[in-house]
């Protein structure tokens, strides 16, 4: 049975007559890296603020670590970065972590050294944060979130502004956390391709609504270049494709859609083939090219 670290049931956040989030049903399995994808303004940060207790929900339920009561206690197991967290620019990385350690009442001073080594800043020495690169600041922010060894890590847009090398470093670090510490991670981004080689499952937010949740395997299937058509007669359509179009590389889906993975430059030919045979009616025919088409 799948164990969920985080669940929401019909979670909503309303500002007067505007829903920033509406009836969101989210499930994040233990040990996964969950990619929360949505354009700016989709509700990603609002959702994260509700999960971490920085804002109050209007409706629905939040369940953390299997519990919907005493969420304040459950949230003590969460580490998070929301947008770019405040760092003390005149301090070193070590000093920043020490301030956070004291504020949180973490007794183990060794956690500072361990965290610096984990995030790759053990050699930063006396260099002030003001002189850090953006990538170094992002890693330090991650280090702050990791203090206390949280079981659930929530990162809001952590790849913003990172160069390709920085993204790769972050990706490897997060994978290491999952593998070695069994941390579950929620990571948000408005660019799906930034998460494509990192996340193991995905949720897509649009205008405050969670459109769908899919696995990496399902996403890869979605991302294969294909022609998608919908029909009210699957059997006749597939016979036409095979016998008259000589098309055999396709998949049929429960929603009466067919995805064709060959003849991708011949959409017009396929359209003509179907329209010239009155036994088949179709309502949707287009080619998917990239992640952004989803």
Name each model feature, range by range.
Residues 283-290:
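Conserved small/polar residues in nucleotide/adenosyl-binding loops
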Residues 171-261:
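ABC transporter nucleotide-binding domain
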Residues 279-280:
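Acidic, proline/serine/threonine- and glycine-rich low-complexity intrinsically disordered segments
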Residues 3-6, 13-187, 192-206, 210-212:
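ABC transporter nucleotide-binding domains
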